[in-house]
């Protein structure tokens, strides 16, 4: 018989740097999950992606065991990295802070495709381009 899921916890953590301090500790502790075990497993799976923010979806079962699924990094993080900017514009319509090429846009869309609500790469590129526009980053040909 399948185990019953008690809670689903969503967190966005730095790859390879999960520790029991907030936000991890309180989120998992209230469901009785072994926090150190989660941190070790998460850090082991994300060690190769250091410096990125990797969202994780943790399913907690009634016997306090857990499983987790790693998602792709947020589009905004990938766009900032490609454009080599620290943060997006606070006035995206007026002040542009950087630009990315179509090739970079396609690469980001390809990375995000499994987590996006898009059927093909063109639709994914439009979604990512919209995110870039809202950050004050232009897409050049």
Curated annotation (Swiss-Prot):
One or more lysine residues are methylated. The keyword Ribosomal protein applies. One of its GO terms (biological process) is translation. The keyword RNA-binding applies. Signal peptide: none annotated. Keywords: Methylation, Ribonucleoprotein, Ribosomal protein, RNA-binding, rRNA-binding. Gene3D superfamilies: Ribosomal protein L11, C-terminal domain, Ribosomal protein L11/L12, N-terminal domain. GO terms for cellular component: cytosolic large ribosomal subunit. GO terms for molecular function: large ribosomal subunit rRNA binding; structural constituent of ribosome. InterPro entries: Ribosomal_uL11, Ribosomal_uL11_bac-typ, Ribosomal_uL11_C, Ribosomal_uL11_C_sf, Ribosomal_uL11_CS, Ribosomal_uL11_N, Ribosomal_uL11_N_sf. Part of the ribosomal stalk of the 50S ribosomal subunit. Interacts with L10 and the large rRNA to form the base of the stalk. L10 forms an elongated spine to which L12 dimers bind in a sequential fashion forming a multimeric L10(L12)X complex. Belongs to the universal ribosomal protein uL11 family. Forms part of the ribosomal stalk which helps the ribosome interact with GTP-bound translation factors. This is Large ribosomal subunit protein uL11. The gene is rplK.
